[in-house]
Amino acid sequence: MTVTTASGQWTFPVLFATLLVGSALVFPVGGLVWSAIASLAIAYLYYLVVEQHPHVGFALQLLALVVVARAKSWWRQACSGSWLASIVRRRKPTLTVDEYRSTLTYWDPVNKKWYIYTFAHGQRSTDLLIFRDENKRDVTPLVEPLLGPLQNFHGASPTPADLGFARLHVFRDGETSYQRQFDRHEPLVLTPH
């Protein structure tokens, strides 16, 4: 496309280049008007390439895809084992769920250690447990955080005295149902006898 002026014929790309250079002299670079004019010039040049030379436009699209793919792989590689990944991981515990198991990973900033706990989905007990103390008050919210996912106190056998109670009554309902009273120094083994 050409434009006829008093001095002769100008092509559209020359007009856009003139407009771009002229706006750079008048408007501050980085301003809103400058950004709009530069965007229009780039869009028009892309349009010219795609319309008049489609094979060049296709090659530019492939080049853009390759550049984006390399940038993504570089970013993943930079973040996978670097200090940036450790900063992101330290903010909160991460729970990874695979098909057959779950893994909980968290960083302890006090001891400067990573803790990883892996457990299978089928191992988690779904039984309902209710704990009552010697005064028949419900103390389940106090004892429940100590139980662990298998509801066995992480393999330990604490006594009611270890937990600060004189006696505990346990009511269990689910796959295994029973009711039992544990005295002060009797180990809390949560399986039926």
Curated annotation (Swiss-Prot):
It is found in: Membrane. InterPro entries: DUF5772. GO terms for cellular component: membrane. The chain crosses the membrane at residues 14-34, 48-68. The keyword Transmembrane helix applies. It comes from the Viruses. Keywords: Membrane, Transmembrane, Transmembrane helix. The keyword Transmembrane helix applies. It is a multi-pass membrane protein. Pfam families: DUF5772. Belongs to the IIV-6 357R family. This is Transmembrane protein 066L. It comes from Invertebrate iridescent virus 3 (IIV-3). The lineage of its organism: Viruses, Varidnaviria, Bamfordvirae, Nucleocytoviricota, Megaviricetes.
